[in-house]
A protein has these predicted regions:
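Acidic, glycine-rich flexible loop segments
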Residues: 102-132
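N-terminal helix-cap/turn-to-beta initiation motif at the start of protein domains
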Residues: 20-34, 58, 85, 132-134
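Short, surface-exposed coil-to-beta transition loops
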Residues: 48-52, 75-80, 99-103, 125-130, ...
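Short beta-strand segments that buttress and anchor functional surface loops
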Residues: 37, 65-71, 91-96, 114-121, ...
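Bacterial N-terminal signal peptides
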Residues: 6-16
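Predominantly extracellular/secreted and cell-surface proteins with exposed
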Residues: 58-62, 67-110
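Edge beta-strand at a domain terminus
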Residues: 107, 128-166
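N-terminal targeting signals for Sec/Tat export/insertion, comprising classic cleavable signal peptides
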Residues: 30-55
Length: 166
């Protein structure tokens, strides 16, 4: 085998294996989900109990998650995540905040996607938060968002939702 062919095989197959790994992982997040948790409408607000229902579909290296979370009569909000894996790197978008659609960028470690949420610039500075989307055992998923408190800079959990596959 020539050095060029060897180099090509080494370059292609690890990437193909990474895509296959991400496809298998994304399949664990596919399905109809329901659950509950707590959400803060902003980092300084008190947490509200919510119930959520989500529909998640994996298609190869892509994941679409759409649904809604409700806090009794206080609010109901549609939420959605669109992600695409490129090797071990993930990019996409998140909707569900009053700030508008945000960009998502991150990687996977084990059964957890670690994503940066980059909110749109609304005339001030762009704000960055984080989202962890985790496959927690068979038929369980957890979504956690964390962002800095605007006055103190302290990291605040703004959402923690535990979901079970229907």
């Amino acid at each position: 085998m020539t050095p060029a062919i060897t180099a090509l095989l080494l370059a292609v197959f690890p990437f193909s294996a990474a895509i296959a790994d991400e496809t298998v992982f994304l399949d664990t997040l596919s399905g109809n989900w329901h659950g509950s948790g707590q959400v803060r409408l902003n980092p300084g607000a008190v947490p509200l109990a919510v119930s959520c229902s989500l529909d998640s579909r994996a298609d190869g290296a892509a994941l679409n998650l759409a649904g809604a979370c409700r806090a009794k009569v206080v609010f109901s909000r549609r939420i959605g995540v669109d992600l695409r894996a490129n090797g071990t790197r993930y990019t996409g978008s998140y909707v569900g905040s009053r700030r508008g659609a945000a960009r998502l960028v991150g990687t996977r470690t084990g059964a957890t996607l670690n994503l940066q949420i980059i909110w749109p610039d609304k005339g001030t500075s762009s704000r960055v938060a984080s989202m962890r989307l985790a496959s927690v055992g068979t038929g369980h998923m957890q979504i956690v968002t964390i962002e800095p408190h605007p006055q103190t800079g302290e990291q605040v959990i703004t959402a923690k939702i535990e979901l079970t596959r229907n």
